[in-house]
Amino acid sequence: MALKSLVVLPLLVLVLLLVRVQPSLGKESAAAKFERQHMDSGNSPSSSSNYCNLMMCCRKMTQGKCKPVNTFVHESLADVKAVCSQKKVTCKNGQTNCYQSKSTMRITDCRETGSSKYPNCAYKTTQVEKHIIVACGGKPSVPVHFDASV
């Protein structure tokens, strides 16, 4: 009986720990989500009008619904992370953790077209060079949200 409780108690503790930790195991961090949704460093902006249709799909922004607007940044991750130590500005939602890039960056804006309807999401692709504004968080401070381009 004593041996049985010696085995059961540690197993119970292990199960409780796994149940508590499990929900966070598959959860994407805000920084990882920012990179998935907004970074396209390895590529110069494509001149293809189909760029947004392909990227929005392969970056999982058309699952369950069409994300109406998204911006891809075509600069190095290091350059985008550096924005978190540049000009501090107020975010669109009033928070104070946004930063504006010192220099313009190559970006592609993707906007859902009027004919777009889930599951056939359709986007207009527009390439521009603008300053980006990102919300930063964590230690070290890294981009966690794309706020705007100006």
Curated annotation (Swiss-Prot):
Query: Which coarse location class applies to the principal site listed for this UniProt protein?
Result: secreted
Record comment: activity regulation: Allosteric regulation by both substrate and reaction products.
| EC class (word) | lyase
One Gene Ontology term of the biological-process aspect is: defense response to Gram-positive bacterium
Q: Secretion signal: which residues? A: 1-26
Give the EC number(s) under which this enzyme is classified.
4.6.1.18
- Which GO CC terms are listed, alphabetically? extracellular region
- SMART domains in the record: RNAse_Pc
Other remarks?
A: Progressive deamidation of Asn-93 transforms the homodimer (beta- 2) into and heterodimer (alpha-beta) and finally a doubly deamidated dimer (alpha-2).
* Protein name as annotated: Seminal ribonuclease
Q: Which organism is it from?
A: Bos taurus (Bovine)
The major lineage groups are:
Eukaryota, Metazoa, Chordata, Craniata, Vertebrata
